[in-house]
Design a protein with these regions (language model features):
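Alpha-helical assembly-interface signal, strongest on the long, hydrophobic N-terminal helix that forms
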Residues: 2-81
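Short, conserved structural patches
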Residues: 2-3, 48, 56-164
């Protein structure tokens, strides 16, 4: 009678049926976490790309204006909505208040040897800069990873003002 339980235990130790199921059960949480991470980072990367495209559009719009600061509100709407006076945002978590517009100047001196300017155009040259600091809310995976509940997306685009 004592031999039967021992034999059963030995047979159970040699039995490989169900081993794949146990291995899959152990690996499944890591695979789910990896898949959600890829989705989260892909979503953040897509949001960054769309925001960068909006900033580029706004900077190009302002570069064609003689006075870029007179049209900064329209440019902010163009960046966020994709059109001036639009109603559907490019990215739901990005707002007009997140966009800043600034104009700076750089010198364009005349080279005494050649008599030509360093850059084509007048002196000084105006540069318009459209920047943003948007907060990507994410799906919550960043908080699990210890990166905080949100992710800040900071980007900008600069264009030389050429006027009309």
């Amino acid at each position: 009678m004592v031999r039967k339980p021992v034999l059963r235990m030995q047979r159970f130790g040699c039995d490989r049926e169900g081993a794949a199921l146990v291995e899959f059960t152990v690996v499944l949480p890591f695979l789910v976490f990896l898949g959600l991470g890829a989705f989260e980072f892909g979503s953040a990367l897509y949001g960054h790309h769309v925001i960068t495209t909006g900033l580029r559009d706004a900077a190009r719009y302002l570069a064609r204006r003689d006075d870029p600061m007179a049209a900064d509100t329209a440019a902010k709407q163009l960046a966020v909505y994709g059109e001036i006076g639009g109603s559907t945002k490019r990215v739901s978590w990005w707002s007009v208040g997140d966009v800043t517009v600034s104009v700076s100047t750089i010198a364009n001196p005349v080279d005494p040897d050649t008599g030509a300017r360093t850059y084509r155009g007048p002196d000084p040259i105006k540069i318009v800069r459209v920047a943003t600091s948007a907060t990507y809310p994410g799906l919550g995976l960043f908080a699990v990873l210890g990166m905080g509940p949100t992710l800040a997306i900071n980007t900008f685009h600069e264009e030389r003002v050429i006027g009309d």
